[in-house]
From Swiss-Prot:
Highest taxon of the lineage: Bacteria
Role noted for this protein: Catalyzes the reversible transfer of the terminal phosphate group between ATP and AMP. Plays an important role in cellular energy homeostasis and in adenine nucleotide metabolism.
Enzyme Commission identifier(s): 2.7.4.3
Similarity-based family: Belongs to the adenylate kinase family.
Domain notes: Consists of three domains, a large central CORE domain and two small peripheral domains, NMPbind and LID, which undergo movements during catalysis. The LID domain closes over the site of phosphoryl transfer upon ATP binding. Assembling and dissambling the active center during each catalytic cycle provides an effective means to prevent ATP hydrolysis.
Gene: adk
Spans annotated as NMP: 30-59
Name listed for the protein in its UniProt record: Adenylate kinase
Lineage of source species: Bacteria, Bacillati, Actinomycetota, Actinomycetes, Propionibacteriales
Main enzyme class: transferase
Organism of provenance: Nocardioides sp. (strain ATCC BAA-499 / JS614)
Amino acid sequence: MRLIIMGPPGAGKGTQAKYIAEHFKIPAISTGDIFRANVTEGTPLGVEAKRYMDAGEYVPDEVTNRMVRNRIDEPDAVGGFLLDGYPRTVAQVEELDGMIRFTGHRLDAVVCLTVDQDEIVGRLLQRAQVEGRADDTEDVIRRRQDLYLEQTAPLIEIYKQRDLVHEVDGIGEVDEVTARIFQALDVIPES
């Protein structure tokens, strides 16, 4: 199964990705985690990505595409994967289409979490305090929200035209949202 989870920063994608990936026995691949790992390791891609992340901007497509391609080529992703935070641009949609087509497979579904903007800002500010994430200041959060609406939200329309989008209300307890996702995907969660 090849899935994408979309929604604005703070919508709960990472949390839900863990449950979806566990159910389908596929890796949850988060571009945020890939970026942070490269930054921590001080790789050339990580140094470049850090400049953009610190400014609350998205990392350029060519850097992101290389990181994602390398990750989905790893053995644990051969049978499928769940992407969190990719694609974010039309060019990345086209790049991902090519990556998946090259393997002889297709994208199965896009889960789109919908969450109120004020709820998101509150979630991210709380997460910044708990996790000590320096990239989650209020100004950076609002900038990412603006970038999401401007650049990423239109991708949902592309996937809607392909009849792949399953919109799910992301407000509520984690298990409630997970149940909605499985219902949208017509999957009965295992206990």
